[in-house]
Design a protein with these regions (language model features):
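Canonical tetratricopeptide repeat
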Residues: 18, 25, 59, 94, ...
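Register position in tetratricopeptide repeats
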Residues: 25, 32, 66-67, 101, ...
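Conserved structural position within tetratricopeptide repeats
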Residues: 45-48, 79-84, 117
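Residue-level recognition of tetratricopeptide repeat
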Residues: 21, 28, 62-63, 97, ...
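Structural signature of tandem alpha-helical TPR/SEL1-like repeats
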Residues: 30-42, 68-80, 102-114, 125
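Helix-start (N-cap) detector for alpha-helical repeat units in TPR-like alpha-solenoids
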Residues: 13, 54-55, 89-90, 123
Length: 149
């Protein structure tokens, strides 16, 4: 995470980030998308205060892609989080999952493999490995189908 913003801006950005997390908690608790949209606005404020705040982009992308079904925006936010913190594994996992279910299987495969190269969390590693195996099986079937034509 780049520390280029003034300390007071980073503190205020973390405050807005925490406020956004609280909105998202209530969105999950009450299954109400308006809370998620309020969380997004809080993450937007955090990012405006500290444009290099990779966690702000990550969390905003997670909520956009997973809770608000705006997968393209979620992937774009993960792209930005990765650009800011390329050795942080979590955005690779989430972007890979978004791509897996809403986009490009080959890009998903690359992201999930990158996640495995960086991550140490056994729970999510197992999920990434499972998704990779399923993508490889699906791509293998597609390639066999293409060759038969």
């Amino acid at each position: 995470m780049t520390e280029s913003a003034a300390p007071w801006r980073r503190v205020l950005a973390y405050w807005w980030y925490a406020w956004g997390l609280s909105w998202c908690y209530w969105g999950i608790r009450w299954a109400n998308q308006s809370y998620f949209r309020s969380g997004i606005r809080s993450f937007d404020r955090a990012i405006r205060l500290w444009p290099q705040f990779s966690r702000g982009f990550y969390r905003r992308g997670l909520i956009r892609g997973r809770e608000l079904n705006d997968h393209a925006a979620g992937i774009a936010d993960m792209d930005r989080a990765i650009a800011l913190a390329p050795e942080w594994p979590d955005p690779y996992l989430q972007r890979g999952l978004f791509q897996r279910f809403h986009g490009d299987q080959r890009a998903a495969l690359a992201d999930l493999r990158r996640y495995l190269a960086l991550a140490h969390d056994p729970t999510w590693r197992a999920e990434a490995e499972r998704q990779i195996a399923m993508i490889q099986a699906e791509l293998g079937e597609e390639e066999v189908g293409t060759l038969e034509r």
